[in-house]
């Protein structure tokens, strides 16, 4: 059951965002999660490494990334993959998503925080990175790394071309996701997951 507010709940502030006004992806720029710019102002910037992982992602983001990368072979960047839970990894492996990541040469990490905390590995010193994590503070993912924060879908497009795409390139690359969105973004239902609990134990 989802949480719901009391009918008489009071809020410190109410922020309304009209999503119809957002016509392109937004990124947090190095190295400040509050420094937000549209993709069109950043297009063309070269990227060395891409991290799709951390608690900010869910299973659908990996299916979407796999869809973007399905016809690729060798990527021009180092791609890191780290789903948030073992159950996600198990299901993605069953669906063949991990096969796509393996074919393109992605480095698959132990599910969990991974690069976001720099507690399993780190990006190269001075690398320019696109990450799906929540923070891009200086030196968090790697020494002197410049880290953009983006969606998993944009991160996958970046991994395929080695730079921040134009808006047109992005829209073309993700066009195959929308017709399959209901299946791609289907959640795992944890209350129905005895087999996954066993697999993750």
Where would I find each of the regions flagged by the language model?
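Fe-S-dependent hydro-lyases/dehydratases of central metabolism
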Residues: 1-201
